[in-house]
Each structure stands twice: as structure tokens, then as C-alpha cells.
Amino acid sequence: MEILEIRTLRGPNYWSGYWKKLIIMRLDIGAYEQKPTNKIRGFYGRMKKVMPGLYEHGCSYGERGGFLKRVKEGTWAGHVIEHFALELQTLAGMDVGYGRTRQTDEEGIYNVVFAYMEEEVGRYVARAAVKHFLELAEGKDIEKIEESITSEVQEMREIREDVRFGPSTGSIVEEAEKRGIPFIRLNDYSLVQLGYGVNQQRIQATTTDKTNMIAVDLAGDKDATKKTLGDMGVPVPKGYR
């Protein structure tokens, strides 16, 4: 099994009209294309033991225990990994609840799609979900898998604390979400775009783009200026980053 690509979506997209923040993992499941979960000896029982919260996943049945039924009947690795990624985020306090897995035109290659709250956490959990599927499928020690999950959940919580907005910016973004206004985080700090296209507005902490302050700050930061121009399609030197 091999992760071919992990992409991060931050706005309107092909996969969902509602969910804007999505991870798209292109995954080659290799030999597991011929081994659905009902053909992997002991997988169902081991999975239930290490992630009991999967019982809450309704999946296509639309009821509690629905996903477990799918696993027992036989489903493919990409679908299971999608649910692992969602459950691990839930354990870390980031309940997003949206996922899709679709086969591509190439045999054994799937697009595993799931929502995230924090981009860095989303990319981290994609790799963790693949790792745990392989550990369970290969019959690795249950206690070690449980210890690994506990450690990863704590790591995700710490990542979120490191990258989450401060109180002021967070309050503005939360209110924007309540009003149905999409947002994109533009850097690792507090520069945020609210809305899209001609209707977009930008804030930095509690400062709006109605003042010159954001422009002055960006112009005084060479790396931030380079990134902003590069994101707009203006050719810039790569520099040291």
C-alpha cells in the first residue's frame, strides 16, 4: 500500500458543496484490492477493540453500527482508512464527520476524501490512518496499536493548540462561520480571508483591510510578500523556503 499524493482543499470544490476544508489522499491499496475486509482474518474484531467509537459511524446504512456492518460484510481498504481518519480526529476533539472514498480509473487506486479542522492535523491523520489499517490487517500487537493511537491523539491536540487562532481572530472566524461566510487562513498566524472573489475581505487579528496596516506589515516582511505574490501567480524567486 502506498500514499501517492495528499492534497489540501481550502475552498469550493468538486467533492462537496458544503465542506470546504478537505484532504484528498490518492492511495494505491496494492494487494488489498483483492482482499476486502471480510477476507482479512481477524480484522473486524481487532478494529472494534482499538477503535470502539467506530460504532457511532452510520455510513451508508444511516444508523449506529452501520460502518461496522459494512466492514463485516466486506469493504475495501480506502473506505476503512477514510473512517479511521474521521475517528482519530474525533478522539482528538475535532469532530468533522464528512468523508468519501471513490475508486479511480486505475485499478487499486482510490481517492480518500475527508474533512479537517486544522490543515496540519488533516495531513497528519491521513498517514496515521493508513498506518493503523496496515497494522490491523497484518495482525500487529493490539496493545502497541492502542498506545500508538493514544500518542497520536495527544500529538494532534498539541498541533491544534499550536496552530489554532488566538481569541480575537477565533471569535471573528466563528461568527463568520455562523453566518455562512467561508474563510481561508492565509498564513500560520492571524491573516485570514473572509469570503471569495470580489466579495472577499481580509483581516489580521482584529485589523481589517479597510486600513493600510495589513499591507504595510506584508510589505515589511519579505517572505510574506513573496508568498502573497506567488499565490497570485506572480513569478517570484524560491528563496530559502
Identify what each model region corresponds to.
Residues 114-241:
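Conserved N-proximal alpha/beta basic substrate-recognition cap immediately N-terminal to
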Residues 1-152, 159:
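Long, compositionally biased, glycine/small-hydrophobic-enriched stretches that function as flexible linkers
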